[in-house]
């Protein structure tokens, strides 16, 4: 692995000149293709949890960006569409039944998944878009018209509801993508962006928008935090009142309650949001 990282780091230093060196380019392209395949298999990840905190593998981001630099756009076709892109689809018209059965996933018409994306077993992909570098863990549902951004990390047994946007990020290199940990529910038409972490078991109501500067308010105490939804929180949209009468309030999101793991498992999402 260290030699692989070294090769990517060296190529990154001369990225603006790569296309001028055909011999080096051939070798690098093979390395990049191998990395993209490792992302497909989930053996390499853009972001990993280490000792209870998330760590960005910047070299993997660099590899993806180098892949864009060194790859020419091609024409792709399936049975009902054609497109012109640098990134191949993970699944194409040539993907056979056995491939899907072995992967143990379900993918319906209209679902677009770019190569370099990991899709674990028992994932259901409705018509949606999943970008390169994303990681979707076991038992998760990506619902209709959801968008999973580049490098976004989605945990096990999550439900990403219809029309939801999960932000991704390739640059800046050190920036974390959005991370949705295990057993989370993200309500319809919500948007989670700018590296926000939604911790395990959290429930996000419909129509909630959270970025790095969004105020996240504990309803009980008034405490305000940023960039992180604590584990097993139930979150709804809200407004912070203005300090001066007659002035407009400002949007925030509100943690209305926090439940334990047992309650989260037993109680329906609708009951938690009431």
From Swiss-Prot:
Belongs to the transferase hexapeptide repeat family. Its EC number is 2.3.1.117. HAMAP family: DapD (MF_00811). GO terms for biological process: diaminopimelate biosynthetic process; lysine biosynthetic process via diaminopimelate. This is 2,3,4,5-tetrahydropyridine-2,6-dicarboxylate N-succinyltransferase. NCBIfam families: dapD, PRK11830.1. The gene is dapD. Substrate binds at residues 106, 143. It is an enzyme of class 2 (transferase). It is found in: Cytoplasm. It catalyses: (S)-2,3,4,5-tetrahydrodipicolinate + succinyl-CoA + H2O = (S)-2-succinylamino-6-oxoheptanedioate + CoA. Keywords: Acyltransferase, Amino-acid biosynthesis, Cytoplasm, Diaminopimelate biosynthesis, Lysine biosynthesis, Repeat, Transferase. GO terms for molecular function: 2,3,4,5-tetrahydropyridine-2,6-dicarboxylate N-succinyltransferase activity. Homotrimer. InterPro entries: DapD_Trfase_Hexpep_rpt_fam (IPR005664), Hexapep (IPR001451), THP_succinylTrfase_dom1 (IPR023180), THP_succinylTrfase_N_sf (IPR037133), Trans_hexapeptide_repeat (IPR050179), Trimer_LpxA-like_sf (IPR011004). GO terms for cellular component: cytoplasm. It comes from Rickettsia conorii (strain ATCC VR-613 / Malish 7). Pfam families: Hexapep (PF00132), Hexapep_2 (PF14602), THDPS_N_2 (PF14805).
